Amino acid sequence: MTADGRSRVDDPRRSRVLASVEAHPAGDDRESQSLDEVRGLLRTLVAPFDRSGGPAHVTASAVVVGVRGVLLHRHRRLHRWLQPGGHLDPGEWPQDAALRECEEETGLAVHHPAAGPVLVHVDVHDAADGHVHLDLRYLVLGPDAAPAPPPGESQEVAWFSWGEATALTDEALAGALRSARRLIATGAVEVPGVTPEETDG
């Protein structure tokens, strides 16, 4: 039961996603605040994974890295270079939504690291539609191939060096790239063909 008396939706994703978020370390002050908000909202929202379930809901995105660098697309409405991502389909897990959205928006086949999905960053932000997005960002591996976005999606999709990507993006995504860089540098995540030194620029 929520504070306003509504019954929470019994969703098996809630406890597992909450556990993943609780285990995720904050990379900076902004992410620390976002983590606090997401933890609280995952416990109290009626339907946190449903975009029609209330003004705040979970979204998922892909921080795509590979031998060509970092993959970004220029958002058609926001006119900013961002990571691919979006809303969850009914019953979909966030890590699966991140892959699906990325493939739909870039035309590239991407996948999680061999050891499984890696939650690399969490960010809470206001969306253009007036909703609040609880964005779960996963480190995703991309192929050595040029993007081929389908008609109807942003045609501005490109690989950038790590330095270029960091300079182009907002502070939240820059934080995600810093976290990804740390995971690669420490060997926590292996990106085939990419050395820690290559993530420096």
Predicted segments, located by residue:
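Alpha-helical and coiled-coil interaction segments, frequently adjacent to or embedded
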Residues: 1-33, 37
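Acidic, metal-coordinating catalytic segment for phosphate/diphosphate chemistry
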Residues: 22-61
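Charged phosphate-binding loop/patch that engages nucleotide di/tri-phosphates or the phosphate backbone
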Residues: 172-201
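Short, well-ordered beta-strand micro-motif
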Residues: 64, 139-141, 161
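Conserved Nudix-box catalytic region and its N-terminal flanking loop in Nudix hydrolases
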Residues: 65-104, 163
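Active-site segment of metal-dependent pyrophosphate-handling enzymes
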Residues: 107-146
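NUDIX/MutT-family hydrolases
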Residues: 148-179
